[in-house]
Structure formats: structure tokens, C-alpha cells
């Protein structure tokens, strides 16, 4: 978890969760632990709530804090969405293991916060100038195909 004294650089308190934003890291070799360490050691304002790789799911920010993750300032994605970074990996088998962990996390969060597939966004939904989540888009072609992997628990 990011130290509490750094939370203000990543977002704002008292977030009301209304969605989930999916990202892929563009660092092909970094693990979830590597990315958490980078967030702690650097002064970036870009944040996320979860980082997922083939080994683990790491929660790095509390879910009642927004995080700057869509590049749109005070937009819906930054203020009301849980951000999940899925670690990219050139080894498709390892990447898919991480993606399955992320899907389990997404399904759990959907249930916890009473969300539907319509409440799941890609980073590019907020900024057409980014190709994120790039590995998901490369594998599935579009959001609809990826969302077909997710089961709603009602």
C-alpha cells in the first residue's frame, strides 16, 4: 500500500465508486511489486488502486480515495472509478494468468459496489489519444469482446 502521507498526490478522499477503469501497463517486464515500488519512490501524480500481474493482485490505494488515472483532470474516470493496472507481459501465457486474476478482481468489485458491465471502462474511453489497455485491445480487438469474459454476480 502506498504510504498514507502520499495519498494526496494521487487523488482526493471520499470517492463514491461508480465504475472501474481498466489499464495495461506499457512496461513489458515490470511486476506488480515493481510498479508499486516505483509509485512509492517517484513523485508522479498518476495513480491506480490495484496492480495485477501473473503472481498477485496488489491494492496500492484505498477504495475511498479517487486516483488520477484517466488524464482528464476532474473527469468521471478520475473521480468515481476504481483503477486497475494489468501488467503487460510479452509472454502471453503469463499475461493471461494476470488477466484472469484481474477478471476475478473485477467481478468481485462489481458485486461489492453493485456495478454492471456498463460500468466498466477502458482508459481510452476517456482519452481517444491513448491505446490503453493496449494488450487487451491487441488480443480482443474491442471492449465488447473483453467484457464477454466477465460474469455479473447478481
Tell me what each language-model feature is:
Residues 44, 63-80, 104-113, 134-140:
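A broadly tuned preference for mixed-charge, low-complexity surface segments
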Residues 1-77:
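N-terminal catalytic cores of peptidoglycan-degrading enzymes
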Residues 26, 66, 80-91:
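Cell-envelope and extracellular/periplasmic
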Residues 22, 82-84, 120-122:
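Hydrophobic faces of well-ordered beta-strands that scaffold small-molecule active sites
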Residues 47-52, 81-86, 110:
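Catalytic nucleophile-His microenvironment captured as a short glycine-rich beta-strand/loop
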Residues 4, 8-16, 89-154:
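Basic/polar, cationic surfaces and motifs that engage anionic cell-wall
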